[in-house]
């Protein structure tokens, strides 16, 4: 059918939507927009149905969000054509013409055609259909038919079955988002804490015959009027944000993508501050709203469950104030938190001590929520309350879940105000993927996992150290404060250490323990930076690190916090290589703190261990001598005994080869591969190797470059596939050995690598490239430090630029932190002696890095 007969309706829809959008931008009232938009579509559909002469026995029904009277700018118009009987062919054609006319007018409809019997059968078979029909609203047509449908729908409605189905649906939806509201680009509608969580509450309230809306829920006694107003306010804010997002995108878009965050912030009048982008302020507002929505969802679903499934189990006493009922913690008197303020913290201590508790009974949960809002300076200053908080941290079990519950229901941020300030604060550093508060609690969880004997195989050293640590609660305090000063400007480690010191003193810790916690917070980045940026085979590096640490207790604590911290930044940042570097640094520093002279004992011991290793392979004791006579002391200082033995085995009787020898093996670190290259030295070897690994999309983690006395390059690379592709390693190792040897043939032209593209995250949150050159304190070269956004081919681009400046690389450490890299190179070259040349190199590298 031509759209011409309905051109006026099409224009009414277009101009009506434009008017609504303009009015909304001028004065953003979400409920007003949604209702007016639904009314506009109601009028057009009714007129269209009348013009087309749709049979009056038919009823046009709005369902879903449109049925609720909430029509977002980009949402589909979901309708049902309700029929008194199965349609005849002529009626079917008329209905098809009606649907086509809707599209011609510009209405993107989602439609179904059903009789009442078919509706009820579909509702019984599919809870999504049942939910849509729960919000059915007549738009046009047969009132009697719609009333008959309503009566029959309510008569067969099984509230308990509906409740179970919607709860299972919510669990599945949350699982699609990893049960986390704190994604970098959350879904406004479907993520945990999004609008759909609020819709679920409304649907379940309807199932319990509670009047619609938050005021109805308050009248039913499930929330106070004040609590209902708070939840309604957050619902309006989320709806307002979703309307803006649809208008900006020009279509349905529910993901808070990086592309829109800054513009949305501007729509809401949020400006950047000295330390935070406007988009970051927007996202903190979103995450805080999501947290309140999750809290309301928890409380109300529990309350509605009790209405539908009354608990008949008798309570089991726990103490004078709390009891266990049906697996939930229940206050014997909900007013206990008013009469005994210490009961608020005791509730979570009880929760930690009783792992059989699945959560809090809903009335108790509401009482906790209300009481948490009254935590003030006087509450925090009460000695009994401080003692309870420290007692919670000292519990052998349940600490993580108790602190997470305190956080979820608003108590943790009230008790530690500095923690409250970082709730929902995102970190756009291309490294952390969690908000600061979620990261802190994840680090604490990681520390607690080290204490679980059944998980000791995951991190054996960490498990052994924490089992022997006399006061693990000090580690948990350090975890709580290590990033608590993020977003303030300045050094967050130093500022956090001040906060930690004050908190520890207030909570009665002695000077030794207070000093340790504050020191850990201040130094929490030192061990990771040392292991990943410096040459930890150098005794001078170990001596300097050990001097900063001071004693083995601090070393143990710092190692534990560092491993937990790195593992808590992102699911992808930790790898076995980082673990090996940290363990190697720990053992070397421990030996130094115990009085060992690493410079004297290290090389001789490693050489002897390498000879023993060679003998295990049936090689003579002097098998390494031919190679070793061409190597200087630096080689023996930088490689461990296993690597030295491997090199000697692979190069036995091949130390004067004319071509390249490439050997690869699975990395002894337990992840990735180790590649040895031995070839006549040339300026382009490092560049060619970097090009090869870039082409096969492997990330270089570490490179040790050594030149022998007889003019050969003996290089070792630790590389890893960060995409974790499923490949057959035996074939892959053979491929690397053959193809890399071919690429090192000087007769073959160097194959350039095209630079990879930046991710959307990197484009919208650019990370400024930093290049810094300084003298190597331990040698005669220079240390080149580079920090920038990661992309494919980056190391090749850096290596190519260094070669162009006639600079040799003799060591490289590549630290990939999510979408950011922090690379450190030890370099030499005549041009580095001239300050203008050094400045030119830094500038040209910045150009390469973009």
Curated annotation (Swiss-Prot):
One of its GO terms (molecular function) is [protein-PII] uridylyltransferase activity. It comes from Thiobacillus denitrificans (strain ATCC 25259 / T1). SMART domains: HDc. Pfam families: GlnD_UR_UTase, HD, NTP_transf_2. The keyword Coiled coil does not apply. Its cofactor is Mg(2+). Residues 674-755, 783-850 form the ACT domain. Its EC number is 2.7.7.59, 3.1.4.-. Uridylyltransferase (UTase) activity is inhibited by glutamine, while glutamine activates uridylyl-removing (UR) activity. The gene is glnD. The lineage of its organism: Bacteria, Pseudomonadati, Pseudomonadota, Betaproteobacteria, Nitrosomonadales. SUPFAM superfamilies: ACT-like, HD-domain/PDEase-like, Nucleotidyltransferase, Nucleotidyltransferase substrate binding subunit/domain. This is Bifunctional uridylyltransferase/uridylyl-removing enzyme. Residues 436-558 form the HD domain. Modifies, by uridylylation and deuridylylation, the PII regulatory proteins (GlnB and homologs), in response to the nitrogen status of the cell that GlnD senses through the glutamine level. Under low glutamine levels, catalyzes the conversion of the PII proteins and UTP to PII-UMP and PPi, while under higher glutamine levels, GlnD hydrolyzes PII-UMP to PII and UMP (deuridylylation). Thus, controls uridylylation state and activity of the PII proteins, and plays an important role in the regulation of nitrogen assimilation and metabolism. Belongs to the GlnD family. It catalyses: [protein-PII]-L-tyrosine + UTP = [protein-PII]-uridylyl-L-tyrosine + diphosphate; [protein-PII]-uridylyl-L-tyrosine + H2O = [protein-PII]-L-tyrosine + UMP + H(+). Keywords: Hydrolase, Magnesium, Multifunctional enzyme, Nucleotidyltransferase, Repeat, Transferase. Has four distinct domains: an N-terminal nucleotidyltransferase (NT) domain responsible for UTase activity, a central HD domain that encodes UR activity, and two C-terminal ACT domains that seem to have a role in glutamine sensing. One of its GO terms (biological process) is regulation of nitrogen utilization. Residues 1-317 are annotated as: Uridylyltransferase. Residues 318-673 are annotated as: Uridylyl-removing.
